[in-house]
């Protein structure tokens, strides 16, 4: 394996000059730079990250804990994170926890051993034990989605779930739907509680009552949505909901599929609105009306905030608040026409 001395010898310069060229820390004549880079390429030289981290007290690496990398919402957020890390010269260690506490502990320990400069936590499955582990890492710059711990040393991203739930339900009501069901995620999750509050507030503002039995608990996965739709379809036709609000797009798409398999039509018989605006939602049949969240922008902003915290651990706490909005497509019928 080539060393910096090998590069210096081939380029006929000092090791100090090679270091300045590679790290861009001092002006070096263009002709000299050319010789150095040609030597680097010929020898396939890679600077030692370990040596650099010891010298600069930084590894230029960021860790990321995520619930499920295959979930389209998290996948799009991760795309924004990875892309911006790359542009800023940082390497990303992505750790898929799958809700497993032992994996969470292992990854946190591994990231600490790797001496990452900062940590992004985008887990929807944070529990008290993991929160305790995170709170022990007081020296590690951290950005956490808003279901995480509230700490003056931790920057946060708030997804404004209550407003999103309100907008989704309000859109259905404005289209003449007064009998609305919803399929939530796990009832104990903060985001789900907030979206339910938004669902309820929209009914109150419209002077409508809602049926608590039509708030059906799912788990953000397809199978749970399918089971919930079975319960809705079991209701007598003239008494069943005319619209369904699903707490993420994956469940909404599964619900549409189940409704159509039963011989009913979306949106003519039952309207469906989702949440997240994942890329697939625009290409389903019918295209899904949903609540948009700026996922790639969230990823980019999370890294921006984290890099600020890495540079200045004492800077004022930052909170980035997402602004949900309705994206109207073809899965909601207008019953007022």
Curated annotation (Swiss-Prot):
Coiled-coil stretches noted in the UniProt entry, renumbered to this chain: none
A molecular function (GO) term: DNA-binding transcription factor activity
Entry keywords, A to Z: DNA-binding, Purine biosynthesis, Repressor, Transcription, Transcription regulation
Keyword hit for Nucleotidyltransferase: no
Name used for this protein in its record: HTH-type transcriptional repressor PurR
Sequence positions that bind hypoxanthine: 73, 189, 191, 220, 276
UniProt keyword annotation of Transcription regulation present: yes
Record PANTHER family: HTH-TYPE TRANSCRIPTIONAL REPRESSOR PURR-RELATED, LACI-RELATED TRANSCRIPTIONAL REPRESSOR
Gene: purR
Matches recorded under InterPro entries: HTH_LacI, LacI/GalR-like_sensor, Lambda_DNA-bd_dom_sf, Peripla_BP_I, Tscrpt_reg_HTH_PurR
Protein origin, superkingdom: Bacteria
Source organism (scientific name): Aliivibrio fischeri (strain ATCC 700601 / ES114) (Vibrio fischeri)
């Amino acid at each position: 394996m080539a060393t910096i001395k090998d590069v210096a010898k081939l380029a006929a310069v000092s090791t100090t000059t090679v270091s300045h060229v590679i790290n861009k820390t001092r002006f070096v004549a263009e002709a000299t730079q050319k010789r150095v880079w040609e030597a680097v390429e010929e020898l396939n030289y890679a600077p030692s990250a370990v040596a650099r981290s010891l010298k600069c007290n930084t590894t230029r690496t960021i860790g990321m804990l995520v619930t499920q990398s295959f979930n389209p919402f998290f996948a799009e957020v991760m795309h924004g994170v990875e892309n911006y890390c790359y542009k800023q010269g940082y390497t990303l260690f992505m750790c898929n926890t799958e809700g497993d506490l032992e994996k969470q502990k292992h990854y946190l320990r591994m990231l600490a051993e790797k001496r990452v400069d900062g940590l992004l936590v985008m887990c929807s499955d944070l529990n008290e034990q993991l929160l305790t582990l995170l709170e022990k890492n007081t020296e590690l710059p951290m950005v956490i989605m808003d279901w995480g711990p509230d700490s003056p040393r931790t920057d946060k991203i708030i997804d404004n779930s209550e407003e999103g739930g309100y907008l989704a339900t309000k859109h259905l009501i404005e289209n003449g739907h007064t009998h609305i069901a919803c399929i939530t995620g796990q009832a104990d999750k903060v985001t789900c509680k907030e979206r339910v509050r938004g669902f309820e507030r929209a009914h109150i503002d419209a002077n409508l009552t809602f049926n608590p039995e039509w708030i059906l608990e799912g788990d953000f996965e397809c199978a749970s949505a399918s089971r919930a739709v079975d319960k809705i379809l079991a209701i007598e036709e003239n008494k069943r909901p005319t619209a369904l609000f699903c707490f993420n797009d994956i469940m909404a798409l599964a619900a549409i599929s189940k409704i159509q398999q039963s011989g009913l039509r979306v949106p003519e018989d039952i309207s469906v609105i989702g949440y997240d605006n994942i890329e697939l939602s625009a290409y389903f049949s019918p295209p899904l009306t949903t609540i948009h969240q700026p996922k790639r922008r969230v990823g980019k902003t999370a890294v921006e905030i984290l890099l600020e915290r890495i540079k200045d651990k004492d800077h004022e706490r930052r909170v980035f608040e997402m602004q949900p909005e309705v994206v109207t497509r073809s899965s909601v019928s207008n019953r007022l026409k």
